[in-house]
Curated annotation (Swiss-Prot):
This is Envelope glycoprotein N. It comes from Bovine herpesvirus 1.1 (strain Cooper). Residues 76-96 are intravirion. The chain crosses the membrane at residues 55-75. GO terms for molecular function: TAP1 binding; TAP2 binding; tapasin binding. Residues 22-54 are virion surface. Keywords: Disulfide bond, Host Golgi apparatus, Host membrane, Membrane, Signal, Transmembrane, Transmembrane helix, Viral envelope protein, Virion. Interacts (via N-terminus) with gM (via N-terminus). The gM-gN heterodimer forms the gCII complex.
Amino acid sequence: MPRSPLIVAVVAAALFAIVRGRDPLLDAMRREGAMDFWSAGCYARGVPLSEPPQALVVFYVALTAVMVAVALYAYGLCFRLMGASGPNKKESRGRG
């Protein structure tokens, strides 16, 4: 299978970037960033419950809409079943 010069060039550039990425200054910066990852100031903030975010409000509105739709469907189904007088009434039978 012949190798395309473009593929060889891309692989060579990727290998060169990997080897070149071993910079001591970059490694030192990564270690320093890893040491400063946890901060007590960030840990103590938590989630504000007094002012819910907009996503939470949208979630509860959607949940309420779904619950209302299910309740209305159940009410309509119950009303149809209670309105049918007997098992041979046309509205209470299936389509088959």
